[in-house]
Amino acid sequence: MTDLTRVVTEIAEEMRARPDRGEVATYIPELARMDPRAFGMVVIDADGEVAAAGDCDVPFSIQSISKVFTLTLALGMVGDRLWRRVGREPSGSPFNSIVQLEYERGIPRNPFINAGAIAVTDVILSRHQPREALGEILRFLQFLAGDAAIAIDESVAASEQRTGYRNMALANFMKAHGVLDNPVPYLLGVYFHHCAIAMTCRQLAEAGRFLAHSGRHPATGHLVVQPERARRINAVMLTCGHYDGSGEFAYRVGLPGKSGVGGGILAIAPGRASIAVWSPGLDAAGNSHLGRIALEMLTKRLGWSIFGQ
């Protein structure tokens, strides 16, 4: 057993024993069915060594983690023109808040809150029909993860469409301010479905490797994005990736990361590793409770915080 595998295994065992597990998301009915006792973790280092523990091969709804990949696609389509429609600043507000959007005339603070991700999805949809746009997002994730079996959990997507009233309000408000180009029903259909993509920790860690290695996926050698763009995506993940808990995550973990209300977190240790962790119980900000604790333990034990040991 390598040192990396030993550390990951020990952390998973410690997480399994903890009584504090957070609360599963209930506002999306399908997510409320998740087992709060589940925990999985995968770390893939620069040499391709995979350290895996726990429920690392159980698929879960990646939810807002998909926003990392839609941001990457949209930047590839329109470049820095994207930033005319969405900002790069932390919001300090809940991920589905409409208050800030009203003050700022329909321009979302960043691409990782719901309003910002809807605006990013609108850019992708402008190049395609809805089914084609969704297909491009899904194929991109399949390519990055090296696994064509990755698919959308249709029951989760349907659940979101039935109950996504706040997202409908956000989209209609932005549409009224001229921020969105496409019809809101089509746009939200794509948005709900890419948030409902299901992946395992192993697949997600593989998909994120290009961000740990200056935009190049080490498994294939493919340059996914230029090094400068990879750095900037990581920067937005660090400052905005955990909603109004982003500062706490940076303080405790010290890595770029993106969470989802399905309980997943994708974290990037630049030059070192791509990390995926999953535990469905959430904290008050909507981030995985045990996932954040596990990543804090990992960076402390390995000295991987970008701010130093």
UniProtKB/Swiss-Prot annotation:
GO biological process, one term: glutamate biosynthetic process
Top-level class of the enzyme under EC nomenclature: hydrolase
Organism superkingdom: Bacteria
Catalytic activity: L-glutamine + H2O = L-glutamate + NH4(+)
Subunit and interaction comment: Homotetramer.
Family annotation (PANTHER family): GLUTAMINASE
Similarity-based family: Belongs to the glutaminase family.
Alphabetical list of HAMAP family matching this protein: Glutaminase
Protein name: Glutaminase
Originating organism: Methylobacterium sp. (strain 4-46)
Lineage, top ranks: Bacteria, Pseudomonadati, Pseudomonadota, Alphaproteobacteria, Hyphomicrobiales
